Amino acid sequence: MNFRGISYYLGLSCYPVSFLSFFNILYSSYFDHYLNLDSYILTLFVSFLFGLSFNFFSKNSEKNIKFYEKLILIFVVYFFISLLISIPYYFGNYQLSFIDSFFEAISGLTTTGFTVFYNVKFLDPTLLIWRSTSHWIGGLFFLIFLILIFSNFKNEYKLT
């Protein structure tokens, strides 16, 4: 199994989370919403460091992975990125448990829209943007994984 190739793609999938947490930090500082700013900064550093470490681990490796490795990659990315997305929910001021914050991140990443919040209208704007960007990341990852699965599909199962 090509663990270095899987870690390369896992490292690449950490960067959209760090970019969108940076966007959320800019939004929070511009509109003076400092309520959960430290959790977004933590998410930025954790996701960027994990992305760098996974890419450093996979340096000078084969980037072409097989079909079953792609399926394992999809499972690992959905689990790991959900852990990264759940950081602002868990360390925010809403006192969510780890399970609730992980559920909120999974529902955002899979774009189902289920929530643990009683009324979403009364959340602070930065958490609403984080919630909507997690839905956006989920849609983006879904499209990327469709392309990843069906790329070189005819060459892997070629009849000779």
Stretches with model-predicted labels:
Residues 1-160:
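Membrane-proximal intracellular helices of multi-pass ion channels
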